[in-house]
Amino acid sequence: MSKDDLIQFTGTVLELLPNANFRVKLENDHLIIAHTSGRMRKNRIRILLGDKVTVEMTPYDLTKGRVIHRH
């Protein structure tokens, strides 16, 4: 799968879960579970409750995603 196949959405962090996972509400009112991308972990970017984030998702599983940017 190439980067072109991934879908990006904007959402808000609703809940902090263990192991750097988050419950995110997308702009289209869907709830997903998202984890922090490796680059955000490496640079120690903190994600807090209520933060606006950009989530990258695969078209095969629309219930999970990866947080790639914090606004």
UniProtKB/Swiss-Prot annotation:
Ranges annotated as spanning the membrane: none
Main location: cytoplasm
Stored PROSITE patterns: S1_IF1_TYPE
Domain of life from the UniProt record: Bacteria
Coiled-coil ranges per UniProt: none
Alphabetical list of SUPFAM superfamilies matching this protein: Nucleic acid-binding proteins
Domain S1-like: from-to ranges: 1-71
GO terms for cellular component: cytosol
GO molecular function: ribosome binding; rRNA binding; translation initiation factor activity
A Pfam family reported for this protein in Swiss-Prot or TrEMBL: eIF-1a
Subcellular localization, as worded in the UniProt entry: Cytoplasm
Keyword vocabulary terms for this entry: Cytoplasm, Initiation factor, Protein biosynthesis, RNA-binding, rRNA-binding
Family affiliation: Belongs to the IF-1 family.
NCBIfam families tied to this protein: infA
Subunit structure: Component of the 30S ribosomal translation pre-initiation complex which assembles on the 30S ribosome in the order IF-2 and IF-3, IF-1 and N-formylmethionyl-tRNA(fMet); mRNA recruitment can occur at any time during PIC assembly.
Reported function: One of the essential components for the initiation of protein synthesis. Stabilizes the binding of IF-2 and IF-3 on the 30S subunit to which N-formylmethionyl-tRNA(fMet) subsequently binds. Helps modulate mRNA selection, yielding the 30S pre-initiation complex (PIC). Upon addition of the 50S ribosomal subunit IF-1, IF-2 and IF-3 are released leaving the mature 70S translation initiation complex.
Protein name from the UniProt record: Translation initiation factor IF-1
